[in-house]
Every structure is written in C-alpha cells, then in structure tokens.
Amino acid sequence: MKERILQEIKTRVNRKSWELWFSSFDVKSIEGNKVVFSVGNLFIKEWLEKKYYSVLSKAVKVVLGNDATFEITYEAFEPHSSYSEPLVKKRAVLLTPLNPDYTFENFVVGPGNSFAYHAALEVAKHPGRYNPLFIYGGVGLGKTHLLQSIGNYVVQNEPDLRVMYITSEKFLNDLVDSMKEGKLNEFREKYRKKVDILLIDDVQFLIGKTGVQTELFHTFNELHDSGKQIVICSDREPQKLSEFQDRLVSRFQMGLVAKLEPPDEETRKSIARKMLEIEHGELPEEVLNFVAENVDDNLRRLRGAIIKLLVYKETTGKEVDLKEAILLLKDFIKPNRVKAMDPIDELIEIVAKVTGVPREEILSNSRNVKALTARRIGMYVAKNYLKSSLRTIAEKFNRSHPVVVDSVKKVKDSLLKGNKQLKALIDEVIGEISRRALSG
C-alpha cells in the first residue's frame, strides 16, 4: 500500500519536482483511511502543504478511497541544550561588509534554483527556524548571491540582529592569527558570542584541515544551541566533503540541505536580461539569446560576456550585432558550441552589405532594380558557389522554383555578355564568404 501511494504521487509530479521536494518524503504510517507522511524538516512540510496539497489528496484518495485523508509530519532535530526557539534576540548591526547587489530581488528564479531560493528566503524571514541551511552547487551558480541576500534582507528588516558573512579561508586565517597572538578567547567570543547570524562561504576550503574543523564544530554547536542561524555554502554536498570530520558533516545535514543546479536556457535568458537591467544597458534580443544559449557553464562567465559586449558598445559607439557578438565572445564559448549560421542566411546578410540593399527588401516582392539585382546575385551564388539545392534556395528567398531557375540563368547570361559591374559584386560577395570562413 505504501509503495502504491508513493507511486501514485510520483506520477503526478515531474522528475525535477520529485527530486527537489520529495527526496526526504516517505509514508510513515497508514491508519485506516489516514496516511501520515514524513519529511526531513519543517520547511519542506510547509512547502508541500502549500504547493502540493491537492496532489497528495488526490493520490491518497485514488489508493484508499474518497474518504482518505493525510497529514505531514517532520523529524525535528533535538539541540544539545533546552533552547529550541527561533532566534529572538535583537542587538547591533552588520559585522562584515555585504555586496548590496546581492539581494533576493536581483536573483532570477528557475527550476534549478527554486528550492534553494525559497529556503534562503525563509531563513532570512525566520532566522533560527531552519537551522542550519546548507546550500551547495557548482562554481558561479549563485551560492554567494543567496548567502549575502540573506544577510542584506536581515539587515534591512531586522536591523538589530548581528550578521556576519565570512569565507572559510577568513575563518581559518582569523583562527591562526588569534593562536599566534594568544587571543584564542577573543576569537571564540567574536564567532560564538557576538554574532546572531553566521554566513559561511566556501566551506570546502577546510577539507583536510582538521584543527580548524574542530574549532568550527564547537562554534557551530554553541551557535545552534543558542538558536542562532547558521548558513553554509559549498561546491559539493555534505557527504562528499572528503577528509571532513563525520560529526561536522552530520551537523551540516541535520537542517535544510538545498542544491543549486545549472540554469536552463530560459532561466539564463532571464538572468541575462536582469544583468542588463542592473548595468543599465541594452543589447539586441538575438544577441542576448545567443549569449544565453552558448555561455552556459556559470553565471559569472555569463555576466562577464555581457559586460564585454556593453563595454565594446560604449567604447566604439557601435551597436553589437550577432556577427560581432560571436567574434567578441570567442573566449567565452566552448569549441563547437556556437551554432553555425545557416549558409544562405549568412549569404543574404553579405549580399545586403555589399549591395546596400536591406535584407528585408531582398526577401520582399520589390521590383526595384537594385533589389532585383541583389536578389538574383544571392540566388546565383547560392546555386553555383554554395551548391545549395534549388528547393532550399526557393525556401530561403521566398520564391518559387521556376523563379530561382530563371534568376540564376539571367545572372549567368549577363556574365557571359561581359557585365563587369555584376561580376565585381559577385566577386566581392564570394570574397567575403571566403574571408569569414577562414576567420572561423
């Protein structure tokens, strides 16, 4: 019965949602027509009740009948001391600088980061309730952005709380310096007594560093036992932190663990637009789409690519078209990632440039002599130089098969009669095609 219920739920949610929200989900018990589900923490419990109530309700009714009901419980971690309430003390201010651009408003939410985003936002709104929060994911996926967004949100909305953002390297260096100077007690006072929300970035830096791990373990315990919020970021999940003390890894896992996945193409496009908005810049939609499609390894590189295009535009005074963007971003794009421009589309672009006739007019029904000549040159070069089929040429130039045959014949006859001006234009078009091919 348990497996039937789980399978029924699984058929009603997509794979990504199942992995994000149901990884700790299980049927705890079935008592008559009542199903008790169990999840890993309060955040997931509340999220499932809010977003998936109808899914769960329908699933249990299908298996157990229309009178079936359900409830969701979660396994709460018992802290070392009797203190278990969310953080309520309010004191001073921000103890370390935060990047003001890292806010929840500037974070673009997509399928791959939705869970981590909402978890971080809930932690910011309710410090101490979901504790600790452990966010992990690859380089440049937004871990630091979320981490500092928590800090910025708390500073804006709970100005009396003391917020500290540090990298694990800074934690290590502070520990070493305090030991050299005989100020270990001051170090512990700083990190255990004088902070209400501790945000630790790049914890994987402490792999193999047993001494500092021990100090972090005791710092963690004291903060957690006092109901103080801890948020940790890493490039890998807790159980893959090799050479980390098991007791510390277990502490990381006892709260909320959220993964950041690489954004899909649509999310990258939204992120690219947000970056343009922040930089007060503009780029053509086709250029923005090209960047989102091809610069996909991490968001830092995506931002770097956009900044490069904006700087080029500002310093040269030129608009950035697709061809220019491809050339400018060669170093940002993995080999063979750029989708090759369709040969005839590129040919039409070149013919437009050489003849001075806009692409739209070449493809229109205009009988203007210049447009007619440009159109015929394009079809002739496509047939005799690119070796394209008549059917393909007809489709690309929006013409019938007989019109293409007639246009190619007219250009050929004119060349045989010694039309030097026409030959010069064709040679220039072919020369530009060759130049582009050689430049990659």
UniProtKB/Swiss-Prot annotation:
The annotated region (Domain I, interacts with DnaA modulators) lies at 1-69
Region (Domain III, AAA+ region): which ranges?
Answer: 97-313
* Gene Ontology cellular-component terms listed: cytoplasm; plasma membrane
Matching entries from PROSITE patterns are given as:
DNAA (PS01008)
SMART domains for the chain = AAA, Bac_DnaA_C
Positions that bind ATP: 140, 142-144
Annotated Mg(2+) binding lies at: 144
Q: Which UniProt keywords apply?
A: ATP-binding, Cytoplasm, DNA replication, DNA-binding, Lipid-binding, Nucleotide-binding
The answer to whether keyword Cell wall biogenesis/degradation applies is no
Show the GO MF annotations.
Answer: ATP binding; ATP hydrolysis activity; DNA replication origin binding; lipid binding
Residues reported in the UniProt entry to bind ADP: 108, 113, 140-145, 300
| Lineage top rank: taxon | Bacteria
Question: Where is the protein localized?
Answer: Cytoplasm
Region annotation (Domain II) maps to: 69-96
Q: Where is this region: Domain IV, binds dsDNA?
A: 314-440
The record describes the protein's role as: Plays an essential role in the initiation and regulation of chromosomal replication. ATP-DnaA binds to the origin of replication (oriC) to initiate formation of the DNA replication initiation complex once per cell cycle. Binds the DnaA box (a 9 base pair repeat at the origin) and separates the double-stranded (ds)DNA. Forms a right-handed helical filament on oriC DNA; dsDNA binds to the exterior of the filament while single-stranded (ss)DNA is stabiized in the filament's interior. The DnaA box consensus is 5'-[ATC][AT]AC[CT]TACCA[CT][CTA]-3' in this bacterium. Mutagenesis of residues that line the central pore blocks dsDNA separation.
Q: Which family does it belong to?
A: Belongs to the DnaA family.
Quote the protein name from its UniProt record.
Answer: Chromosomal replication initiator protein DnaA
Gene this chain is encoded by: dnaA
